[in-house]
């Protein structure tokens, strides 16, 4: 889960990372009141989970509370790269002397963590990495020790901080690691990390991504979800403990096991090239418990996507036998009733496959077509989706 800037700021503050005052506002009046409370120069910042706010006009400096009101009025409701601005953060103005960059993230390729740091912050890090890679220090971080004092000193030294700043910057970096570790984050980024005119080191703009798989031990994270920006289908799937990701195609996909589902997406995409370019509409892994309720919930999510024209159910029976899956499909269609209106292509293989096929054949549901192989099923589902278009 990606956080808004104000949420990242609040997490930073909770872990002792030095930040400036910031108050979230959802109306121009709230923005004015926040600016009056903070006092002095403030910055009105659109709260969206996408970059490029400044270029889009979503970040404005306000010298007075009245200016903050006018800026908030202009920014609220703005569309920034497809994201509607529902709230702004009124941030205390900073006397910036220098801008730096710091982030810590998962390094999946090397199965560790990676800290990245530069004395050249404030710009897009991708641009810096491409144009001047030598200006971006990359330091592996051990999962056993994390960013301790020694590692923090190594980071600031490799980044090229002057000797007189290293202790202060290293201290902030250790606190940012605490955010990363204690909050089960997959990314903590500060751009810019700044030195103010009086020599203080502050985290001015933060980005945090949290690991959804750690929600069971992070009770406070549920309150950070903004339901206004959640995809309703993904929210419904999550509520039913389904692993679902919406894509932009026309063939709904249900499978058991992430590996099988990903393979199914590839096969559907390949088959779609022969049928008008149709593509997979989603990733949906029902796991090992493909009973009637789970199957009904899965179908309910997929059939709620208006883009879906057909559904391909691809199941390999293992612990959950194919006859149980078949019974689940039949009962799921009974549960959904008139809500089930799109054709289903079902491919079963593995444990109790013959019994599973027999159950579906005897049910003789008009929406269900049996396929002997994954390739055959993907081709038929793609054909049906193309025909429906």
Curated annotation (Swiss-Prot):
Residues 9-236 form the ATP-grasp domain. It comes from the Bacteria. InterPro entries: ATP-grasp (IPR011761), ATP-grasp_succ-CoA_synth-type (IPR013650), ATP_grasp_subdomain_1 (IPR013815), Succ-CoA_synthase_bsu_CS (IPR017866), SUCC_ACL_C (IPR005811), Succ_CoA_ligase-like_bsu (IPR005809), Succinyl-CoA_synth-like (IPR016102). Substrate binds at residues 256, 318-320. Its EC number is 6.2.1.5. Pathway: Carbohydrate metabolism; tricarboxylic acid cycle; succinate from succinyl-CoA (ligase route): step 1/1. Gene3D superfamilies: ATP-grasp fold, A domain, ATP-grasp fold, B domain, Succinyl-CoA synthetase domains. Its cofactor is Mg(2+). Binds 1 Mg(2+) ion per subunit. Mg(2+) binds at residues 191, 205. PANTHER family: SUCCINATE--COA LIGASE [GDP-FORMING] SUBUNIT BETA, MITOCHONDRIAL, SUCCINYL-COA SYNTHETASE BETA CHAIN. Succinyl-CoA synthetase functions in the citric acid cycle (TCA), coupling the hydrolysis of succinyl-CoA to the synthesis of either ATP or GTP and thus represents the only step of substrate-level phosphorylation in the TCA. The beta subunit provides nucleotide specificity of the enzyme and binds the substrate succinate, while the binding sites for coenzyme A and phosphate are found in the alpha subunit. Heterotetramer of two alpha and two beta subunits. This is Succinate--CoA ligase [ADP-forming] subunit beta. It comes from Micrococcus luteus (strain ATCC 4698 / DSM 20030 / JCM 1464 / CCM 169 / CCUG 5858 / IAM 1056 / NBRC 3333 / NCIMB 9278 / NCTC 2665 / VKM Ac-2230).
